[in-house]
Structure formats: C-alpha cells, structure tokens
From Swiss-Prot, chain B:
The protein's name in its UniProt record: Ubiquitin-related modifier 1
Gene Ontology CC terms: cytosol
Compartments (UniProt record): Cytoplasm
List of residues that carry 1-thioglycine: 122
Organism: Laccaria bicolor (strain S238N-H82 / ATCC MYA-4686)
Function: Acts as a sulfur carrier required for 2-thiolation of mcm(5)S(2)U at tRNA wobble positions of cytosolic tRNA(Lys), tRNA(Glu) and tRNA(Gln). Serves as sulfur donor in tRNA 2-thiolation reaction by being thiocarboxylated (-COSH) at its C-terminus by the MOCS3 homolog UBA4. The sulfur is then transferred to tRNA to form 2-thiolation of mcm(5)S(2)U. Prior mcm(5) tRNA modification by the elongator complex is required for 2-thiolation. Also acts as a ubiquitin-like protein (UBL) that is covalently conjugated via an isopeptide bond to lysine residues of target proteins such as AHP1.
Example GO BP: tRNA wobble uridine modification
InterPro entries xref list: Beta-grasp_dom_sf, Mopterin_synth/thiamin_S_b, Urm1
Pfam families: Urm1
Main location: cytoplasm
PTM field: C-terminal thiocarboxylation occurs in 2 steps, it is first acyl-adenylated (-COAMP) via the hesA/moeB/thiF part of UBA4, then thiocarboxylated (-COSH) via the rhodanese domain of UBA4.
UniProt keywords, alphabetically: Cytoplasm, Isopeptide bond, tRNA processing, Ubl conjugation pathway
Length: 510, 122
C-alpha cells in the first residue's frame, strides 16, 4: 500500500453504503419525515434537538460529581466552578449554546422545534436541575467563558476577541438573561508575568527586556517544524485555560472538541508520538501548583461533544441561528500532520460516517502498558519513564556517530550542510537535563527534524524563553557565562537534581 | 414566482463561514435554466445548437453554477471531484440533501438551498 491520500481511491477498497437505512421516516418518533441523517440514522428536526442535548449530557454529567455515583444516581453537584473554553469555532460555539440552554436557563432547545411554541417555558418538571438564576445548582459561582486569542503567533491573523465577546454577551440578552464571566486571554500570556502572577506563584527571576509577544514568537520560531508549532500552540492554549480555571477554583473545564476533531487529535497525536497520553485526549484530570505552591484540587477536562460530530454541530448552529466567529486553524500548513489528518477524517466522515466514532471509541480504550512516573513539565500530562533512553535506541540521532562513520553511510542531502547539535555544552552537570522531565511528544515537538528542512531560523539568540509554568518548576537565573546575557541556565529549586540547561534542548539546530 | 417557464428561481444561503468565499454575502437569490447541458457547462445556454445533450437542472448543476458565477475565491475550498468538498453540508428546503438524492435532486422553482461549512472546527 502506498502513502497516497487514502480518500482518492477509497471506493476501490470499500463499498459505499447508502447514506441512510431503509426509509426517510424519523427513527425516533417514527412519524415525521426525517430532516437529517446522522451515521445512517434518520431524524426529524423535532427529534434532532433532544438527541444532541442528550448526547451532550451523557458525555458530561457522569463526570460532574467528584466521585462516581453508586447504583442510585445522586443529584449533580460539582466541587467547584465551571470554565467553558471557547475558540470561536463551530464545536465550542455549539457547546456554549448547549451549556447555556441545559444548565443556565437560556431559552430551551425544545422551543426551537417546530412543535413547540416559542413562549413555552422550559421543561421544569423533566429537568429539575435546570436553573434560571445567576448560577446553577450544579456548579459553584458564576461560570466563566475563556477565549485564548492566538493571533500573536500568526502574523496577519485577525484578532477575534471582540467578536467572540459578542457571542458570549448574546446570552445576556436572551430571556431569561444569563451573564457568563468572559475572560479573554492571549497566547502570549503564557510568557507574561502579569498574567502568571494572577494564577501562579513567582519563584524565579524572569528574563529581562523581552515582551510577552516577543517571547512567544521566539519560542515558536525555535521549534523545528510547522507541525511542532501547531502542537506547541495547542499545549499553550490548554494550559492557559487550566491555570485560569485553577485560579477560579474550577472543578471542570469544558472543551468543544467534537467527535470529528477528537478523532483528528487522536490520530495526529499518535502520529506525533503522543500515544502515551491518548486516553487523556478523551478525558483527563489535572492538578496545578497553586499560588502558595500546594497542588490545586483536581480539575476535570471534559469534552462533552465527544460523541457529536461536526455535521450535527453545524446543523445545530444553523437551526439555532448561532453565529460562528471562526477560528485560526493553526494546523501547521497544508502538508502538516494536522491538516492531512483533518482532510482524511473529514472525507472519511462523509463517506463512512460510522468509522469516525469507531476511531474515537477505540482510542479511548487504549491504556499504556506501563504507568506514568511523573508529569511533563511543558504540557503537564503524565509522562513516561525513560523517554531519552528509548529515543536513543530507536532513532538516528547523529550522523557523526561512530558506527555511521565507519559504515560509510552518507548524510541525506537535506542534512548535508547541517552541523549536529553538540550533545553536551559546558553545563555544570551535563547528565542532568530538561529532557527527563518531558513527555515523548513534547520532546519530539522541541527537537524533531523535519524531512522538509526546518522552518525559518530567525533568531540569533541561543536560548529560547519557555512558558512561565515551566520556569515555575525550574528556577531560571541568568548565567554569567555569556556576556550577551542570552544564555540561560536552569536550576531546580531544592536539591538541585535538575541543574540543567533548558537552552541546550532548545538550541537552534543549525 | 418565476414568470419564465424556462428558468427557475432559487434562494441560496451560505453558513458556517462558507459565505466568505461568496463575497461574504450569506443570502443570494439566483435564476438558473430549467434545462441544462448534460456536461454541467454553465457558460452556454441550452438554446445553443452546439449542445444538444441536456437534462433537467439538478443540484450538481447548481454547484457548478455557484462555482462559475458566484464564487469569488479559492474554488478548491468549495468543490472537489464534481461535488462539494467533504465537510460542506447541503440542506434542500431544510432537509439534509442525503435524504433527497444529493446531487441528483431535481430542482424546483422556489427551492431553498443551504450550504454550510463545518471546516471552521471546534
Ligand atoms: Zn422524529
Ligand atoms: Zn509533554
């Protein structure tokens, strides 16, 4: 089998099923003529809304209570507040709408069906949990909607903050009105001390004379590939949301990852070496270090649309009249792993709609054979032991290696002029390193070479800033070794086990 | 609605960001011939003697018409292999076109066709 785009010749491999089973009648009410086909099943418009909101609640509600319910289902009661991540994209816009309508009294979805008159009050008897007040009975406090503007990473990209704000504020004009706290963040906040002081603890000396936006750009431009920039951006967004959630004592962060996007993330994650944390992509729990250094209560990251495809999201948005601001798709270019995977999954979903949910379900069952023995400093997901040794056994790391020299193999053309990164610099302790504290995926993101050549090498500076949560775990102090002040060494708080140079890891390759 | 039985009037709506390819205009009203060239050529009329092979106007023809006459940029984001690109949904009179025969649906005067992009992600 070749590596061509599989969507081209797919019909030669698998017979195309009819798009829907048997009749055009709705499978739910078995009365009305259907309006939409979802994974071969036909639904009418009136049955579509409860179908989607039921799937949403089934994905979210079992993780609301801190401990799973026994045989008898208890009332939903979260241990903290709610934070909704909104990207401006289709999935998260629909998720926000479902959250508002299901838990915070926005006009019910049932009102939108053709059968129900618009003035009909919400089904209070059926949904006693639903509230129309300032906060629901489920989460504490006022729920927040958090948006991370990524335009700082992509020159020329539009700043959508105000348009997203309008989406959030539109729920304050519904009847009954409900006001979310809107928290606009920016990608560069990950490098901004002012932001960090609000959510974390400042244990280290910050880098001098760099603005957050320059630090962000230096960080991203140090990465070896477009694909790496994409995954680094996703990691920044994720942790900005998590630290913000922790600062609000949130127990739940909701992300609008649809079934379609989940499958894309799972497949492209595995392709980029994140197989170890595949299960986390579907459901994860995170604890950060709070302002006083102790671990925060666990925050659950839930994707309540993980069983709802993009098609259903688009139809929901259309029938509910939602405005989609759109989002920057930082997929790493048209040939990046993210773009290729998305095109593949989108085509698969159209032609074989059931297979996409199979991907998600299969990946959710994956568990690593060996447990994690720590948390990756960069993405703060569980990390696997011994990444460095494993990598050194399975990949070609240096063409200067003796066995290659003696065997007479030549460098591939794209590496012919590259000099290998020195294995060790003049560190106090070359054996200690940031590497042992990274997961395999983050290590790959920071160091992998692209077969197409590296992206632009713009920065002369030898060492690159890192997100502040990394620096909070390693204390950053400038060394006197380099009079330009560009080299940073890292020193661990406490026993000095991690005396290492982050810079060594992040050096430009050529 | 149409006064000329040789043409039909259609309402076209774009959603989910697809309107960006169509002068950022969400709603369009267009008129197309009732009988169209079998090869989906939208630049000739069926009155031309040179194109004898015709068929009633269907959604596939409409897609070609939208591409040739309304699309302002980036054709590859709209059509692929003679139909809409994966990730673009089509509703015919508020019903999924998969229930209506997709591209083979024969258009009627006054039909409302909605095209929605799902590619803005979440
Ligand atoms: Zn029904
Ligand atoms: Zn990591």
């Amino acid at each position: 089998m070749s590596c061509e785009n599989p969507s081209v010749d797919k019909d030669a491999l698998m017979a195309r099923r009819p798009k829907f089973d048997k009749t055009k009648q709705c499978v739910k009410c078995k009365e009305r003529t259907g309006n939409v086909v979802i994974r071969h099943a036909v639904y009418c418009k009136s049955c579509f809304f409860p179908l989607i909101s039921t799937r949403f609640r089934k994905s979210l509600e079992p993780s609301v209570n801190p401990t799973p319910d026994g045989p008898r289902r208890k009332a939903l009661k979260a241990s903290g507040s709610l934070l909704v991540g909104l990207s401006g994209g289709l999935g998260s816009t629909v998720m926000l709408d479902l959250v508002a309508k299901t838990y915070f009294g926005a006009p019910s979805v049932a009102d939108l069906g053709e059968e129900a008159p618009p003035s009909k009050p919400k089904g209070g008897k059926e949904h006693p949990r639903n509230m129309t007040g300032k906060d629901s009975e489920i989460w504490r406090g006022v729920p927040a909607v958090c948006y991370v503007e990524v335009c700082g990473a992509f020159p020329g990209a539009e700043d959508r903050t105000e348009r997203v704000r309008q989406v959030v504020e539109s729920y304050a004009t519904t009847s009954p009105p409900f006001a979310f706290d809107f928290i606009p963040l920016r990608l560069e906040d990950a490098f901004d001390l002012e932001w960090w002081k609000g959510v974390g603890e400042l244990l280290f000396t910050p880098p001098p004379s760099s603005t957050p936006i320059l630090a962000l750009q230096a960080y991203l431009s140090s990465l070896p590939t477009q694909t790496a920039i994409h995954s680094a951006t996703q990691t920044l967004v994720r942790l900005l949301l998590l630290y913000t959630a922790a600062s609000r004592r949130a127990s739940h962060v909701l992300l609008g990852t649809s079934l379609t996007s989940l499958s894309v993330n799972l497949i492209s994650g595995i392709a980029q070496g994140a197989g170890f944390s595949v299960a986390e992509e579907a459901m994860e729990e995170w604890r950060g270090e709070g302002k006083s250094g102790e671990l925060t209560p666990p925050i659950r990251i839930v994707r309540p649309l993980r069983d709802v495809g993009m098609k259903e999201c688009a139809i929901w948005a259309w029938w509910c009249g939602l405005r989609i601001v759109g989002r920057e798709r930082y997929l790493g270019g048209t040939q990046g792993i993210g773009s290729l995977t998305r095109n593949f999954i989108t085509g698969l979903e159209r032609d074989y709609p059931a297979t996409v949910s199979t991907i998600a379900r299969t990946c959710a069952k994956l568990t690593p054979k060996e447990g994690s023995d720590g948390v990756c400093l960069l993405c703060q997901r569980p990390a696997q032991h011994g990444v460095q040794e494993w990598k050194s056994r399975t990949s070609i790391r240096s063409y200067n290696h003796a066995s290659f020299s003696s065997s007479g193999h030549e460098r591939p053309p794209h590496l012919a002029n590259a000099t290998d990164r020195p294995q060790h610099r003049t560190e106090p302790s070359p054996s200690s390193h940031l590497t042992p504290h990274l997961c395999y995926a983050c290590h790959t993101t920071l160091t992998s070479r692209s077969s197409r050549g590296n992206v632009k090498q713009t920065s002369d500076s030898k060492v690159v800033p890192l997100p502040l949560w990394v620096g909070a775990s390693l204390s950053l102090v400038p060394t006197s070794e380099d009079s330009s002040g560009e080299v940073w060494a890292t020193r661990r708080m406490g026993d000095g086990e991690m005396k290492a140079a982050i810079g060594d890891l992040l050096l430009n390759d050529s | 609605m149409s006064t000329d039985s040789n043409t039909m009037f259609l309402k076209i709506e774009f959603g989910g960001g697809l309107e960006l390819l169509f002068s950022n205009q969400r709603s369009h009203r267009i008129t197309i011939p009732s009988t169209v060239p079998a090869d989906n050529n939208t630049s000739v009329t069926t009155k031309d003697a040179a194109s004898p092979a015709t068929r009633p106007a269907d959604v596939t023809y409409l897609l070609h018409h939208l591409r040739d006459h309304l699309l302002k940029e980036r054709e590859e984001l709209f059509m692929e292999n003679g139909t809409v690109r994966p990730g673009i949904l089509v509703l015919i009179n508020d019903t999924d076109w998969e229930l209506e025969g997709e591209g083979e649906y024969l258009l009627k005067d006054g039909d409302e066709i909605v095209l929605i992009s799902t590619l803005h992600g979440g």
